[in-house]
Curated annotation (Swiss-Prot):
Coiled-coil segments: none
MF terms (GO), sorted A to Z: guanylate cyclase activator activity
Gene, per the UniProt record: GUCA2B
Gene Ontology cellular component list: extracellular exosome; extracellular region
Domain of life: Eukaryota
Native organism taxonomy: Eukaryota, Metazoa, Chordata, Craniata, Vertebrata
Provenance organism: Homo sapiens
Protein name, per record: Guanylate cyclase activator 2B
UniProt record similarity statement: Belongs to the guanylin family.
Length: 112
């Protein structure tokens, strides 16, 4: 009897484990050889919204201002080394905000 009760719980436990596994997997965006986490793009938006660098710093650098922020996520730092950093960040933002470009679900098959 105890064995039947335990086997009846297995499907429920399996579903819970799958949900936990799915929620711990990171979603990545790949573009022009760069691989960044979706979560990093959300942090980038937050950094840009709350940080205004000095006009002197902006004038001295060809890089996007956020490249000078000390809290820039590590996976975004290589983008700053690129000569096309501004356009790459712009494209990554577009991809991150477009559900049809980004599978937000592990089982995603794309938009119709």
């Amino acid at each position: 009897m105890g064995c039947r009760a335990a086997s009846g719980l297995l499907p429920g436990v399996a579903v819970v484990l799958l949900l936990l596994l799915q929620s711990t997997q990171s979603v990545y965006i790949q573009y022009q050889g760069f691989r960044v986490q979706l979560e990093s793009m959300k942090k980038l938006s937050d950094l840009e919204a709350q940080w205004a660098p000095s006009p002197r710093l902006q004038a001295q650098s060809l890089l996007p201002a956020v490249c000078h922020h000390p809290a820039l996520p590590q996976d975004l730092q290589p983008v700053c080394a690129s000569q096309e950093a501004s356009s790459i960040f712009k494209t990554l933002r577009t991809i991150a905000n477009d559900d049809c470009e980004l599978c937000v679900n592990v089982a995603c098959t794309g938009c119709l």
